[in-house]
Amino acid sequence: MKRFILFCLFMSAPLFADEELSPQQTVENYFEFFNNEDRASLNASSGNPFVFVIGGKPTAYPKYGDAVDFDGMKASGWSYSRIHKNELIYQDDISAMVDINFSRYNNDDEVVSTTDVVYLLVMRDGSWKVKGGFVDGNLTLGRD
């Protein structure tokens, strides 16, 4: 009986190993939610408060959804974003940082802007949450 229980434990471990998304996968999902203008999923995948440091200016928002204005984004020419580089800087049990380079594109698939950002993620209730973004240079969130 003891062997059977051990067998079941070892066999079930891989089933649960894939349930937790990596920090890099979490950021990829975050970009997908952004492209879909899915404010509820963005808020669910981010920590509260959410902090952006853009061009050296730190701003805290109650939720990520409070930081972005999709109508303003569209007015700036944005249609969608695409990640070019997604590198894990570090990861421990409670935090991680991911280095991202991405571009924003317009409706004609032309690059509107290209930006480097480092995202800070925290582990909350068994899931990675995007807690903050550190943007090199300027980046509109549609509220300008």
Question: Which residues does each PLM region occupy?
Answer:
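Short, low-complexity N-terminal intrinsically disordered segments enriched in polar/charged residues
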Residues: C8, S12-A40, A44
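A short gly/proline-enriched turn/hairpin at secondary-structure junctions
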Residues: S46-Y61, S76
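Surface-exposed, charged secondary-structure patches
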Residues: A67-E110
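Hydrophobic pocket/interface hotspot
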Residues: Y30, S41-L42, F50, V98, ...
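A mature extracytoplasmic/lumenal domain signature
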Residues: S46, G56, I100-R104, V117-Y119, ...
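Beta-strand elements of well-folded, non-transmembrane domains
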Residues: N35, R104-N106, L121
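Sec-dependent signal peptide recognition
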Residues: M1-F7
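Short beta-strand edge/turn micro-motifs at domain boundaries
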Residues: T114-D144
